[in-house]
Amino acid sequence: MTRHYARSKSNERAVDSTPVNTPCSTTILSSVRLNGQTAYTVYHGGTTAEQFAEYLKSILLPTLSKDDIIVMDNMRSHHAKMVKKILDASVIRYLYLPPYSPDFNPIEKMWSKIKAYLRKVKIRVATELPNAIDKAFLTVCPSDCSGWFSSCYCVR
């Protein structure tokens, strides 16, 4: 990832370099909680219903209690029959946000922070990316999450 903005001395142009190679895409599936906890996984390629279902079964659901609620946007894999089947079989409640409503989704604000960190560290070698992602998630703290949830009208 590359930065979108830069600083420079007055009347001087900001200069930076970026390699021209096109790496394969890396996808991160994650969740965020009011207390600052996150549960995430990283893999290459896009998100399929099978990958999202596996994330739910092996990573997210084991960390949740019966009072938790999973809030999902309208990504196609979130609406897959197998995903709904897994969620219905669990004791966890779930709901979907209205279409085109990122302002109600605290995870969008978390992604902004994660992506800003990854742009800042300028990882250009694929083997260094997992470590950078781990460090990026460590920057998410409970006070951040509290603010994100409040700004999305999730907490009164």
Segments from the language model and where they lie:
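Extended, low-complexity cationic-aromatic segments
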Residues: 1-57, 153-154
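RNase H-like polynucleotidyl transferase catalytic core
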Residues: 12-20, 90-106
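Short, basic/hydrophobic alpha-helical segments
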Residues: 51-69
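Acidic/histidine-rich, metal-coordinating catalytic segments
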Residues: 66-79, 105
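Short beta-strand segments
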Residues: 68-72, 96-98, 150
